[in-house]
Amino acid sequence: MMQAKLSFGDFTQGLNAGDLTFVQDIHGYMLNNGCKATFEEKKTGLLGSYKHTKSKKSILNLLIKKHGLLVRIYGENISEYRDFLNTLTEEMVQSIDSASICSRLVNNGCSTKCSGYDFTIGSEHFQKCRYNCFEFLVNEESAPYIRAFIENETNARTAA
């Protein structure tokens, strides 16, 4: 499968009704908050990426794969809303726990440009890779928490 640029309509074409509503909501929110969106076809599925215009960095990715819709949030400002992490569902915390450990934080073995994430949820300390730490499967239970997470990060970047 070749990598190809897609329109938003092409990107959302195969989604079920629940996922479509979620994606449309997030898409509108991101555009209304000054983010630029791109959509592509990749080998492993479809990728939607949103870059924050102020920070010029990706704030989130939407990934449509065979097993469902995933959201990857780049939580660069988690220190500004760390209490929010304590509200995440058990399934979301398990997803964070199973994410890769940050090689740079643990043994200085990764790129110096990658800071990784160092945070706590409850009494548990995490040092995780930024590329899969906050990657969540969208479902009825996780959707409102994912939306709130995106809002927290977007607000923190806008205020910076």
Where are the language model's segments positioned?
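Charge-dense, helix-prone N-terminal extensions
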Residues: 1-160
